[in-house]
């Protein structure tokens, strides 16, 4: 008997059709919406006088990184040394690592990349101990590491908690010949509550104020230091605040949203609606490009269907999958029927429980397309996704590097 190789979940050959040829479940990206989102965010950031370094942790698809860079992105944001190595292998040559570089093995991964003089890398620091460790490690290798001070908020995530801590850390960096202070960074996504909008504006203004203070004190090692913030929900407020503070006049302003590339049918759809409410000049927003497709597996009771889709396939931390359309398996051209009135009520490891709306007729083997909420935690469940055209034909396989 001929040996058979393992098959990767959701893998498909170029030219395959989603409803006829692809083993499901599958991660699906719609080309038209994806390209729209890449253009939309690049235009928004450029028109705001800033640069874009999209957070690659969302998809960890180097092929998407290249599309974003070709559209004008300044660089790619990443979360750790392993992600940085994957992006470098995929052709990325400028990285903001929006995290602290901790641990000698992780430092070694970055040191290897810094042997390439064309590789521009910046990581965050928020504590003198980390500064000392980095200074010692990179000095021993004859390398100089670009670091940025992270400024945070009380009760938030990482980052110095006071302006005085920032100033003291800048002095500690100055004392390390192997380190270069290239900017200041913050993350506003941890600011919540009734006064979140004003709190985010104040936080962005404080970043600029601190950057000006450090620049006036000669702390930076770049003539035009970097100032950066912005996740995927409040990027408009950060852009607006940086503009109001004239940050672009003295600094390289960099925004770092990531989820926009795929968007979603959940939390980022809601966040985008808020952006459009705040910005009446934006007459069109982002489009959901990401779906997960799966078969109806069982219909053991009236009005109840079990879908061959579970926690191994789709995010469930910020809302359950949203049924979108029903397709008859094998029928091409595929005309999907609206099933948005159906509701997923629970997910298990490999199963989703779906209440079937009155008037919706399903049969075993039917294909349901699902929207998701929080794309970062859907992408990481896949090693390959299907990029499809408007006819639902696979035009490219996109590989992840988680």
Name the predicted role of every residue range.
Residues 55-194:
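Active-site-proximal beta-alpha core segment in soluble small-molecule metabolic enzymes
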Residues 152-280:
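Active-site loop/helix belt of alpha/beta enzymes
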Residues 1-112, 387, 398-402:
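A charged N-terminal "starter" segment
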Residues 19-30, 93-97, 111-122, 194-201, ...:
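Glycine-rich tight-turn/loop motif centered on a GG-T
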Residues 301-402:
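C-terminal accessory subdomain/extension
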């Amino acid at each position: 008997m001929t040996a058979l190789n393992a098959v990767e979940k959701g893998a498909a050959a170029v030219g395959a059709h989603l409803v006829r040829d692809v083993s499901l479940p599958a991660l699906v990206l719609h080309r038209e919406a994806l390209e729209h989102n890449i253009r939309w965010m690049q235009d928004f950031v450029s028109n705001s006088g800033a640069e874009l370094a999209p957070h690659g942790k969302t998809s960890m698809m180097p092929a998407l990184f290249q599309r974003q860079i070709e559209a004008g992105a300044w660089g790619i944001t990443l979360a750790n040394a392993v992600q940085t190595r994957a992006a470098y292998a995929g052709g990325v040559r400028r990285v903001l690592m929006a995290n602290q570089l901790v641990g000698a093995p992780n430092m070694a991964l970055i040191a290897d990349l810094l042997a390439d003089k064309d590789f521009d890398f910046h990581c965050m620091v928020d504590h003198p101990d980390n500064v000392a460790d980095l200074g010692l490690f990179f000095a021993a290798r004859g390398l100089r590491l670009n670091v940025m001070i992270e400024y945070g908020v009380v009760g938030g995530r990482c980052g110095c908690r006071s302006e005085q801590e920032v100033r003291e850390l800048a002095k500690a960096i100055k004392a390390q010949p192997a380190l270069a202070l290239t900017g200041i960074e913050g993350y506003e996504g941890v600011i919540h509550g009734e006064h979140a909008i004003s709190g985010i504006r104040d936080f962005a203004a404080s970043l600029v104020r601190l950057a000006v203070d450090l620049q006036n004190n000669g702390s930076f090692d770049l003539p035009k230091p970097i100032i950066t913030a912005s996740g995927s929900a409040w990027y408009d407020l950060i852009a607006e605040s940086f503009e109001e503070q004239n940050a672009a006049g003295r600094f390289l302003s960099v925004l770092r949203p990531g989820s926009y590339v795929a968007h979603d049918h959940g939390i980022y759809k809601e966040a985008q609606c808020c952006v459009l409410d705040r910005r009446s000049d934006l007459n069109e927003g982002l489009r959901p490009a990401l779906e997960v497709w799966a078969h109806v597996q069982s219909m053991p009771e009236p009005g109840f269907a079990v879908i061959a889709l579970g926690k191994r396939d789709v995010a469930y931390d910020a809302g359950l999958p949203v049924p979108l359309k029903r397709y008859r398996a094998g029928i091409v051209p595929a005309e999907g029927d609206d099933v948005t009135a159906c509701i997923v009520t629970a997910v298990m490891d490999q199963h989703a429980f779906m209440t079937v709306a009155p008037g919706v007729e399903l049969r075993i083997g039917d294909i349901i397309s699902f929207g998701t909420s929080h794309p970062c935690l859907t992408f990481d469940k896949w090693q390959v996704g299907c990029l499809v055209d408007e006819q639902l034909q696979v035009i490219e396989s996109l590989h992840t590097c988680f």
